[in-house]
Amino acid sequence: MDKDKKGAKQDLSEILQFVAPGTPLREGIENVLRAKTGGLIVVGFNDKVKEVVDGGFHINSSFSPAHLYELAKMDGAIILSDSGQKILYANTQLMPEATIPSSETGMRHRTAERVAKQTGCLIIAISERRNVITLYQENMKYILKDIGFILTKANQAIQTLEKYKLILDHAISNLNALEFEELVTFGDVISVLHRYEMVLRIKNEINMYIKELGTEGHLIRLQVSELITDMEQEAALFVKDYVKEKIKDPFVLLKQLQDMSSFELLDDAILLKLLGYSATTNMEEYVFPRGYRLLHKIPRLPMPIVENVVEAFGHLKLIIEADVKDLDEVEGIGAVRAQKIKKGLKRLQEKHYTDRQL
């Protein structure tokens, strides 16, 4: 965990990375699990933790898996620093407020849940009999899964990602041709936006598996990287092309999209409103892209130049119609680059027309 976030709440992805296979902490936890001694680990030592800690002895030594294993043989809880790099206390008794509700039945897990809610710190409970590692923080509870199980789920998700990526590629290929023909409708835009989001959601799910797998997730990471390189960037440029009012940071809108429920994502009216249009917009009405996405596909054309071209012409249609002289007048574009843009757009148009015919 981030050393600077003393006692701060971490999101689940950060926590999973913190205890992932390959980390010293996970090695120590696995040793305790195999020894079947059980254990309770508190990560962080803020004022709220001090209120619930009683007894034990001060260690204040560097963390090592071997030290954790030996100290876990005692009944009390182990207190680590926020970064997990130091063992601060061992054999402590945790005494959270008994009035804090808990859904757990075992004493160790009930204590862990209450301490997590009272302090906001990450609490790791290692089961003595069930061979289970449970993470608690505030109201969050997460049971770490077996590595083999996670790998199976990750591989299934990769297969799903491949299928959705094919569907997205087909939709984008069709959109490319429609953009050159000036035949894009709001229905096409919403359809592609939905497909982008579905692919990104599956990617985010796989990323959670990768974080939980730690060093075991290297091959999964490579597969995802190969499948959807620069996908967020392309989705962001697509948003910049079709959002009603120009925006500086399309990733804010993409984040709003990711925060939507599956039900909201299927509602065309909600997606139209997200892009700044009326919910009653006719889906068959034509809409014209600004040209960010296609211009970005031209090799060695920097994003600031793309921005200047769009700013100068407004829409892709006018950029395509512009001659070399018109392009040459745009800031940052000389005669050579103007020729490159004209040829690049022509090649893209021919390629996308051919792809569509196939």
From Swiss-Prot:
Q: Which residues does ATP bind? A: G76, L94, M107, R108, H109, R110, T111
Q: What InterPro entries does the annotation carry?
A: DisA, DisA_sf, DNA_integrity_DisA_N_sf, DNA_integrity_scan_DisA_link, DNA_integrity_scan_DisA_N, DNA_integrity_scanning_protein, RuvA_2-like
Highest taxon of source: Bacteria
Catalysed reactions, semicolon-separated: 2 ATP = 3',3'-c-di-AMP + 2 diphosphate
EC top class named in words: transferase
Q: Which GO terms describe its biological process?
A: DNA repair
Give the EC number(s) listed in the UniProt record.
2.7.7.85
Any idea which UniProt keywords this protein has? ATP-binding, DNA damage, DNA repair, DNA-binding, Magnesium, Nucleotide-binding, Nucleotidyltransferase, Transferase
Where does the DAC domain start and stop, copy by copy? 9-147
Check the record and name the Gene3D superfamilies matching this protein. Answer: 5' to 3' exonuclease, C-terminal subdomain, DNA integrity scanning linker region, DNA integrity scanning protein, DisA, N-terminal domain
Needed cofactors, names only, are: Mg(2+)
* One function term, GO molecular function aspect: diadenylate cyclase activity
Whom does it interact with, and what assembly results? Homooctamer.
Q: Which NCBIfam families match?
A: PRK13482.1
Q: State the similarity comment.
A: Belongs to the DisA family.
Described purpose of this protein according to its UniProt entry: Participates in a DNA-damage check-point that is active prior to asymmetric division when DNA is damaged. DisA forms globular foci that rapidly scan along the chromosomes during sporulation, searching for lesions. When a lesion is present, DisA pauses at the lesion site. This triggers a cellular response that culminates in a temporary block in sporulation initiation. Also has diadenylate cyclase activity, catalyzing the condensation of 2 ATP molecules into cyclic di-AMP (c-di-AMP). c-di-AMP acts as a signaling molecule that couples DNA integrity with progression of sporulation. The rise in c-di-AMP level generated by DisA while scanning the chromosome, operates as a positive signal that advances sporulation; upon encountering a lesion, the DisA focus arrests at the damaged site and halts c-di-AMP synthesis.
Protein name, as recorded: DNA integrity scanning protein DisA
Species annotation: Bacillus licheniformis (strain ATCC 14580 / DSM 13 / JCM 2505 / CCUG 7422 / NBRC 12200 / NCIMB 9375 / NCTC 10341 / NRRL NRS-1264 / Gibson 46)
